[in-house]
Design a protein with these regions (language model features):
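Short, charged, amphipathic alpha-helices and their helix-cap/turn boundaries
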Residues: 36-40
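Short amphipathic C-terminal alpha-helix that caps PH/PH-like domains
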Residues: 74-78, 143, 194-202
Length: 288
């Protein structure tokens, strides 16, 4: 098993299990020997038929081409295949609690470094759709960059105080009945100081936002990252298809970023303060 003993996988699994009671996000993603052995042909066939059904696919073709020739060839190819009727995709019916399942979890590994993840269980964004939802997501992109990015007060403080020796990172995931933010570092020397600083920021994020000038810098950084997607056809096609699946238009995104104001950042910061927190720690017990 190439994943079971991998530190990053271990802390990710701990975080998911600590955040959620019932959401399938907490379930095993990669699997272990025991769970894989239970997989049957019927399971694989059901997944294949759903995943590759035309009603569940978005095809994005990027590059210089004759659009009509390309799509004619696609239609010809697909018409030769036999598909069942359109498969209706249903969300699992479950209720997720507002609280986190565990506020703290810890384990140890045979490594010489400590991994720490501080995760925030947010209110899901299910009530927001299209452009409105995309704007909220991008506002959080900027907010998190201001609070925990490479140029943030947090990162400078952690490096100066030798809490860690290299910048870690942050991420967020937003799906049906699920929205969480995670700040993590995989080489923490002082776990208590690292966790305390993140919790202090979460309790009063406005204090750490610096000013509107810093906001404009981070906003331009997000715009630059978006424009850079055009330089990589693989990333571009992935971004377009992901947005289409969420009923969003890729070509609206730049204007959405431009429309974000400092007041939008403050609103998201207020929501961030309401999050429920869980801390996951993987301690290294090996000395170099």
């Amino acid at each position: 098993m190439i994943y079971v003993d991998e530190p990053g996988y271990i802390i990710d699994k701990m975080t998911r299990n600590s955040l959620y009671f019932n959401h399938p996000f907490k379930d095993e993603i990669i699997g272990d020997i025991a769970s894989i052995k239970k997989t049957t042909f019927a399971h694989l066939k059901a997944c294949h038929d759903l995943f590759y059904h035309p009603s569940n696919m978005i095809l994005v073709v990027v590059g210089k081409m004759d659009v009509y020739i390309v799509f004619s060839e696609i239609k010809r190819n697909q018409s030769q295949k036999q598909f069942k009727e359109s498969i209706l995709i249903k969300y699992l019916d479950f209720k997720e609690k507002r609280e986190v399942k565990e506020e703290y979890s810890e384990t140890s590994i045979d490594k010489s470094y400590n991994l720490v993840s501080v995760a925030f269980k947010m209110e899901p964004l299910d009530d927001y759709k299209g452009i409105e939802r995309s704007k909220i997501e991008k506002t959080y992109d900027i907010l998190l960059s201001m609070l925990f990015g490479g140029s943030s007060l947090h990162n400078k403080k952690m490096l100066e105080n030798k809490v860690y020796n290299d910048y870690g990172g942050y991420e967020y995931s937003n799906f049906h009945q699920m929205f969480y933010i995670s700040v993590s570092n995989y080489n923490v020397f002082d776990i208590d100081k690292y966790v305390k600083d993140i919790k202090d920021i979460a309790s009063d994020p406005e204090k750490y936002l610096l000013d509107e000038k810093f906001f404009e810098i981070q906003k331009k950084g997000l715009m630059s990252s978006f424009i850079n997607e055009f330089n990589n056809l693989t990333n571009l096609s992935l971004e377009i298809s992901t947005l289409l699946a969420d009923n969003n238009n890729f070509f609206d995104q730049l204007e959405i970023i431009k429309s974000i104001t400092y007041n939008d950042i403050i609103k998201c910061a207020e929501e961030f303060k309401k999050a429920k927190i869980t801390i996951s720690v993987v301690k290294g017990n090996k000395n170099d």
